């Protein structure tokens, strides 16, 4: 009788280790990060984004494979032309209001308004656009490398005629 209980305990411990092991290993090489708002370092958004936005990398490296967390700060009147990304992204509005539309043309009338606290999950390769009427800050969680492919290549700020 005791042998049966001992075997069940051992099997239970093995099952727990199998479930917990990958989760523990996943973050084992990552140091914990604590960042307060005043400590965030904002820089100009990459050249693939329209000028005027600021970005802060909170975790990971958007230019490399793997998870990352960034914040994007946009001025009033900021617009990102229709585009798509290779990876899924989760977006949370921290302040202001972000307008998102799912189409190949920017149409302010059909955009969804997401105010502070609002959340949007966007599967990879979905065509969309975004704009803000007031200064807005969003947090984006995704996997790198981050890319932005404009539906109309002429909308790509990197290819804009100077």
Which functions belong to the PLM regions below?
Residues 2-12:
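Bacterial N-terminal signal peptides that target proteins for export
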Residues 75-78, 84-105:
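Glycine- and acidic-residue-biased ligand/ion/polar-headgroup-sensing regions
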């Amino acid at each position: 009788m005791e042998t049966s209980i001992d075997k069940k305990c051992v099997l239970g411990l093995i099952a727990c280790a199998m479930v917990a092991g990958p989760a523990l290993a996943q973050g084992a090489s990552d140091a914990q990060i604590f960042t307060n708002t005043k400590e965030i370092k904002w820089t100009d958004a990459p050249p693939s984004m329209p000028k005027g936005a600021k970005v802060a990398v909170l975790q990971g490296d958007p230019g490399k494979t793997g998870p990352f967390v960034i914040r994007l700060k946009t001025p009033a009147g900021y617009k990102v032309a229709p585009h798509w990304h290779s990876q899924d992204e989760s977006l949370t509005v921290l302040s202001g209001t972000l307008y998102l539309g799912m189409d190949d043309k920017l149409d302010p009338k059909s955009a969804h308004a997401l105010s502070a606290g609002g959340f949007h999950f966007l599967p990879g390769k979905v065509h969309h656009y975004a704009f803000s009427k007031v200064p807005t800050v969003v947090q984006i969680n995704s996997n790198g490398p981050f890319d932005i492919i404009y539906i109309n290549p002429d909308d790509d700020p990197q290819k804009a005629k100077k």
